[in-house]
Structures are given as structure tokens and as C-alpha cells.
Regions:
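Active-site-proximal helix-loop-helix substrate-binding element of RNase H-like nuclease domains
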Residues: 31, 40, 44-130
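Mobile, glycine- and charge-enriched loop segments
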Residues: 1-11
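Short, well-ordered loop/turn elements at secondary-structure boundaries
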Residues: 15-21, 66-68, 72, 127, ...
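Short active-site loop/helix that positions an aromatic residue
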Residues: 30-40, 218-225
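Proline-aspartate-enriched helix->loop->beta-strand connector
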Residues: 9-33
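Anionic group-transfer/hydrolysis microenvironments
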Residues: 27, 76, 218
Length: 225
């Protein structure tokens, strides 16, 4: 039954105790589905053991769960962020066909039919999905790229999507060198709403300047061509 399945999954999870998880669209399917099913079947306290410090938080502003102590790098987000062509579809089938020349395992009927009538075929279908993501990363090395950038920028792996976080990393590193312990940044749900005026925009004076850089080349490029 489902409870037995989830308990066996958790035992294997504790045995591995991953510090980094990846998969295709895991932020919006696999992780929330798994967490919510464990909550429903085994209880929330058991679901929180996905985190080594038993802290799983719903990030409303990012519409995803954060498993404290476990970095979740959604490979679909990595692919979107580090490739330059706009794809008509970002499904695993479409991207694996493009990058590997092969796709998901074919089957007749629905996935529910496959599970009920051919459990080994159902397992093979899911294992094939895992293999596709692994082979895409073996080719493109986007996990290594994201980790390298985040190590350089002194930010958590999940923050590869947010260029301004590298300013936080630089500030924290500088303060550490000065022997200053920076306060923890408040969580989004701890920040009180305050109406603020818009930022000051200074009229640019054309010229050549030192010590100027822009973190966001995506928005910078159209303004300098």
C-alpha cells in the first residue's frame, strides 16, 4: 500500500541523505507532490524528515517548498536559464529529443493503466526519465555550472536564478573578512509590508567610468546596442 511505499522510500532517503536533488520540473511537481502525499499518509512530522533539521517551508513568493539542508536544483530551470534559444516546449520529451536524439518510453493507454497492468513497465518508464535527465547533464554539465557560479558568488545553489543575490554574497564575504557577523536576512513572511517611494533614477552622463558593472546582462544588452 501507499504507506508502506512511502516508508520504504524514506528509509532509502535516510540512507542516502542527499544534500542536492535534481530532476525535471521537481520544484512544481515531484517535490510538492511527494511532500504533500507524505503529509497526508504518514503525517506532517514525518514529511519534515526530508530535511536533516526537520524544517520544510512553503515559499509563497516563489511558489515552491524549501527543504532546509537539501538544495533542490530543478533541471528544467537550469536548462531555461543557461541556454540561449527559446524552445516551443520545455517538456522532458521535447528537450531530450533535441539534446539526446531519444525521448520518453512509449506505452499504450494511460500511466494509471501501465501501473495496474505492467508494474515493471511502469518502473522502467520512471527509470528512463531519470536516465534522460542524467544523460542531458552528462552532455551539458549545467549542474557543475550552477554550483561553480554559486560557489564563486557565495550564495546557496537555489539562488542561481537571481543575479542580485551575488551582491549579498559579496557583502557577506567582505563583512566576514572584517570580522563582522551579519544578521540573518528575514524570511519573506517575516517582512512587514511598507509602502516605499520608487528608487532614485539619476540622469546618465555619457562617458567612460571605472568600477561600474551590471549583473543582469539580459536587460543590459538591449540598452547598450
Amino acid at each position: 500500500d501507499e504507506a508502506t511505499l512511502l516508508n520504504k522510500f524514506l528509509l532509502k532517503y535516510y540512507e542516502i541523505m542527499p544534500t542536492l536533488i535534481t530532476g525535471w520540473n521537481i520544484d512544481f511537481f515531484d517535490i510538492p507532490y511527494l511532500y504533500n502525499r507524505i503529509c497526508h499518509v504518514l503525517g506532517e512530522s514525518q514529511a519534515r524528515t526530508l530535511s536533516p533539521i526537520k524544517d520544510v517551508i512553503w515559499l509563497k513568493h516563489r511558489n515552491r517548498y524549501r527543504i532546509s539542508g537539501v538544495s533542490c536544483l530543478d533541471y528544467m530551470a537550469l536548462y531555461k536559464n543557461f541556454t540561449y534559444n527559446e524552445e516551443s516546449s520545455y517538456s522532458l520529451e521535447a528537450i531530450s529529443q533535441k539534446e539526446l536524439g531519444k525521448g520518453k518510453m512509449k506505452y499504450e493507454g494511460t500511466l494509471d493503466d501501465l501501473m495496474k497492468n505492467d508494474i515493471q513497465g511502469y518502473i522502467d518508464y520512471n527509470m528512463n526519465d531519470v536516465d534522460l535527465v542524467y544523460e542531458i547533464d552528462q552532455k551539458m554539465k549545467l549542474m557543475d555550472l550552477a554550483r561553480g557560479i554559486c560557489h564563486k558568488g557565495h550564495v546557496p545553489y537555489e539562488d542561481f536564478l537571481f543575479p542580485t543575490r551575488y551582491l549579498d554574497g559579496a557583502a557577506l564575504t567582505y563583512m566576514k573578512r572584517l570580522g563582522i557577523v551579519a544578521p540573518n536576512k528575514p524570511r519573506h513572511d517575516e517582512i512587514k509590508h511598507v509602502d516605499l517611494l520608487g528608487a532614485y533614477v539619476k540622469a546618465p552622463n555619457p562617458g567612460r567610468y571605472k568600477w561600474v558593472y551590471d549583473l543582469d546582462l539580459t536587460s543590459l544588452y538591449p540598452s547598450i546596442i
